[in-house]
Amino acid sequence: MASPEERLLDELNNVIVSFLCDSGSLEVERCSGAHVFSRGSSQPLCTVKLRHGQIYHLEFVYKFLAFKLKNCNYPSSPVFVISNNGLATTLRCFLHEPSGLRSGQSGPCLGLSTDVDLPKNSIIMLGQDDFIKFKSPLVFPAELDLLKSMVVCRAYITEHRTTMQFLVFQAANAQKASRVMDMISDMSQQLSRSGQVEDTGARVTGGGGPRPGVTHSGCLGDSHVRGRGGWDLDNFSEAETEDEASYAPWRDKDSWSESEAAPWKKELVRHPIRRHRTRETRRMRGSHSRVEHVPPETRETVVGGAWRYSWRATPYLARVLAVTAVALLLMFLRWT
């Protein structure tokens, strides 16, 4: 049975594989072991080989990893390092800042800008505040939130030059941009319910291991998984993939709990929840009023212990009586 540290590493790797890039599969080299959590260690969580012309959602993946680590009470924030060793350009994801990177031991450390030429043996290090500092001169302060603007990286890798272009994507509609978070919250609720069922079954059988006859799906490996609210290359807010084959990595893995997704759900679907409550209130009020004012269905009533037939005029008879009364009134006025 996997330890909690191994399960957390699998969850973080699945987040990177699923949301880092939209098109194509990623070449990911995963690392495992408790030394990944050691402070100052040079062992990354995973290493992703960057390809020419691809767009990578760096800020979204970074915020996702930071959110999960914060819920696990991890003391430090993740660090992304883009490096060029002359043979390949890679993105290394660390759970903390490795020692010696800023001092230049691994090569010159370049800052984040719109176009960054990445020569051989140079690196670009992205920390907790680098995305906000990069977006601040480009967008309004109200648009610094992840749902309104997102920093992405487009890689230009050729034989003679390697350039990283950092862009800010903005969503024309915040509701479309929040569908990814909505999907995450829905998946977490499904997993919480399925986890409770599995725990109940394990207690009944008397053990916590896998039960005979029940198969559990494994990790996603290096395959690319795209969420239903994933972003397009040109406009991440307009992309909507509705095919049933697009799964989230935690659909088959017990990775998210309801408490982890609660802050995101509360922030992102506040207005839809309010509208849902309004509809529920109106429905309850309407049903209550109908119950109060619905006439009796039976045509028999009991008054004072005596039976009395309840006569009610049909709609067409009421119309006939009204027309007759109007005709008699006109005749009376004509004769007078």
UniProtKB/Swiss-Prot annotation:
Subcellular localization, as worded in the UniProt entry? Host nucleus inner membrane; Host cytoplasm, Host perinuclear region
Q: Topology relative to the membrane, per the entry?
A: Single-pass membrane protein
Q: Which residues lie on this side of the membrane: Perinuclear space?
A: 1-315
User: Quick one: where's region Disordered?
Assistant: 193-221, 277-297
Q: Which HAMAP family match?
A: HSV_NEC2
Complex and partners: Forms a heterodimeric viral nuclear egress complex (NEC) with NEC1. Interacts with host IKBKE; this interaction inhibits host IKBKE kinase activity and IRF3 nuclear translocation.
Q: What is this protein called?
A: Nuclear egress protein 2
Source species: Epstein-Barr virus (strain B95-8) (HHV-4)
- The encoding gene is NEC2
